[in-house]
């Protein structure tokens, strides 16, 4: 492994490691053991959905007052995509690029632990954005910090599915145009992949640091 690359999911992410990654502009890659954890959890979730007749909140059901509404297997990804789109409503001032990179770093690390049920490609695309300074535009207001930084994290994740705007090469660009430039397909969300990205407090975490 190059000294200019840090393997996400290879161990504890300390303040010292975070500082080095940001200050030395290190690139990120998934550690082999992280890939195994992510895939194992995704496989478990797929099996659970296929084999269980019980509703799984926010996965095979709607959210909140719609928790009694069952979602068909063909609409599980659409449910998650709609969750991201509907919550991407942060307002206020644009968050500084260095904080956006920190949020993506924390997000990638959390997902690399293999407890969220996301696809490998989802985590890899976060790393692609980080490594190429494709920085989602996120605003600093819109979070209670209770069940997660819902609106800011939805805005952070929105460009991965080809929606919203990013800062790239010093300019504000449509996310889909930057995806096309790199030859990246928008991530097609599967079950739980809208819940997983927004159910953290990565924006508020940088303030405590």
Give the residues covered by each predicted segment.
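Single conserved hydrophobic/aromatic residue that forms the stacking wall/gate
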Residues: 202-205, 209
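Catalytic cores of large soluble enzymes that bind and process phosphate-bearing ligands
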Residues: 6-10, 30-37, 71-75, 91-95, ...
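Conserved phosphate/anionic-ligand binding catalytic regions in large, soluble enzymes, centered on
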Residues: 55-68, 140-159
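Alpha-helical scaffold segments in soluble metabolic enzymes
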Residues: 17-20, 44, 82, 102, ...
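Glycine-/small-residue-rich beta-strand-loop submotif within the FAD-binding core of flavoenzymes
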Residues: 12-13, 17-20, 24, 69-98, ...
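N- or domain-start disorder-to-order transition segments that initiate the globular core
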Residues: 2-51
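Structural motif
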Residues: 27, 54-57, 102, 135-136, ...
